[in-house]
Amino acid sequence: MKLPKSFRLFGKPWTIKRRKLKESGNCCHYKAEVQLDPRKTSSGQIKTTLLHEVVHAIEGDMDIKISEKDVNRISVGLYAWMKDNPKVVKWLLKN
């Protein structure tokens, strides 16, 4: 499946870019952009990396402080929960 090019957070559009980075991913609040380096992640890891950067985007937009260790724990935990419970995720997203 192809990497999405964008997402919305609190009604604001964000872009997803592929970039050469020092780390696997980066969240750039002033550009409303998540940057991912696919060279540094497997196909499964890129999903958790994207979710990790989205948690950083939420952190910035809600003006909260979460340690990098906890951002990682939250993103990995949410991804595992979504993967294990697709019916619940589908139910949550129904209008």
Where are the regions a protein language model picked out?
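Metalloprotease/metallohydrolase-associated module, dominated by Zn2+-dependent proteases
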Residues: 1-45, 61-95
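Active-site recognition of the HExxH zinc-binding catalytic motif
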Residues: 48-60
